[in-house]
């Protein structure tokens, strides 16, 4: 904890010093999100607690840009997750300190190229096509893609290998009429003839034009992230999604699939979502549902999750929210379903 505090202070002072020398080139930024509630996912016992990351995983860090002239810029991102309920760094105990971002790059008319740890191909398409965004607590789509329960194991998830990749080369294209693409390549850095050449590769596409947004991604992963970076069974996954803003309501939909070749396993997930702005207020009602079918040979199981919520902005940077969630699996086990309810506050800086 002392080391965490010392690191935070050092980086904050450095950012302040650099900002004074080159105005707005370096920024200390982040989000703090805490909630209180009673949580029970399928297969688990009920827990009443204060938690971190109700709608957004809490994070902080430093970002910077230097204008090199001729339209070329250098930039860097060094950002870290933390648990606001305890002040502990990381999303979990073994999480690397700068597990959100640790990369440096060059950007220009050609797009951007960066080296280091950054987003995996699955992240942006997933969070842009569901009303609860990047919530690892109440977004049905994000939960089915990334989060296990006592009744729903890692092999039943639809994300190949975490929402961020280490040892990565990332190329981001400029916008072509509202269409952007990101090409990801993670070196496996493995030795030995059996594991040589193991790697993660992926691509995503995002289109935005007027009320319509479309996304898609593909990943083929052989390297675990973010801790051990060990070789894992080859897993491939893809998803297509979109949203349309009718002004009175915004609709979301996704469909995706994941396969683990060594197990002959196939996981299929689809989701629907809805945002309804409350007229005359800075508030929005949210509803989302996701269903995943996991099949191994002739054996299959399903998971269904539904969330209903309300998000109210007190300012451009601060909002409060309330969410209720239902989670259920089809297997014949104790506690096969669960309900959760929480209220929280989120502040961006």
Regions found by a protein language model. Name each.
Residues 24-38, 47-188, 197-199, 206-210:
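Outer membrane beta-barrel
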Residues 30-36, 78-80, 117, 183-185, ...:
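Transmembrane beta-barrel strands of outer-membrane/channel proteins
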Residues 68, 72-74, 110-114, 178-181, ...:
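Repeated loop/turn-to-beta-strand initiation elements of outer-membrane beta-barrel proteins
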Residues 56-60, 100-106, 165-169, 199-203, ...:
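Hydrophobic, lipid-facing positions within transmembrane beta-strands of outer-membrane proteins
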Residues 1-25:
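Cleavable N-terminal export/targeting peptides
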Residues 312, 337-349:
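Outer-membrane beta-barrel "beta-signal"
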Residues 196-307:
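Detector for outer-membrane/organellar transmembrane beta-barrel domains
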Residues 36-44, 82-88, 121-125, 189-193, ...:
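Gram-negative outer-membrane beta-barrel proteins
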């Amino acid at each position: 904890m002392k080391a965490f505090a010392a690191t935070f202070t050092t980086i904050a002072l450095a950012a302040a010093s650099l900002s004074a020398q080159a105005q707005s080139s370096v920024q200390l930024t982040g989000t703090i999100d805490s909630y209180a509630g009673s949580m029970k996912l399928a297969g688990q016992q009920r827990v009443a607690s204060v938690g971190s990351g109700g709608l957004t995983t809490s994070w902080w860090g430093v970002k910077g840009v230097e204008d090199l002239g001729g339209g070329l810029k250098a930039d860097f991102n060094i950002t870290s997750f933390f648990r606001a309920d305890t002040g502990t760094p990381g999303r979990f105990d073994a999480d690397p300190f700068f597990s959100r971002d640790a990369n440096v790059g060059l950007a220009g008319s050609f797009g951007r190229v960066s080296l280091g740890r950054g987003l995996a191909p699955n992240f942006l398409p997933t969070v842009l096509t569901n009303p609860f965004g990047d919530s690892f607590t109440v977004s049905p789509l994000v939960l089915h893609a990334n989060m296990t329960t006592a009744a729903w194991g890692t092999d039943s998830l639809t994300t190949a290998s975490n929402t961020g990749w280490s040892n990565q080369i990332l190329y981001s294209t400029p916008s072509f009429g509202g269409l952007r693409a990101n090409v990801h390549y993670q070196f496996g850095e493995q030795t030995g003839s059996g594991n040589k050449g193991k790697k993660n590769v992926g691509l995503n596409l995002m289109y935005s034009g007027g009320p319509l947004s479309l996304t898609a991604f593909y990943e083929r992963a052989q390297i675990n992230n973010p801790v051990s970076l060990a070789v894992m069974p080859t897993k491939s996954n893809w998803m297509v999604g979109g949203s349309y803003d009718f002004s009175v309501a915004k609709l979301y939909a996704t469909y995706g699939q994941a396969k683990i070749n060594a197990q002959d396993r196939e996981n299929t997930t689809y989701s629907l979502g809805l945002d309804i702005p409350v007229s005359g207020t800075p508030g929005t009602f949210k509803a989302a549902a996701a269903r995943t079918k996991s099949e191994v040979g002739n054996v299959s199981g399903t998971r269904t999750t539904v969330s209903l919520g309300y998000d109210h902005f007190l300012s451009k940077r601060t909002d409060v929210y309330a969410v209720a969630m239902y989670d259920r699996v089809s297997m014949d086990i104790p506690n096969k379903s669960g309900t959760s309810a929480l209220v929280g506050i989120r502040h961006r800086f």
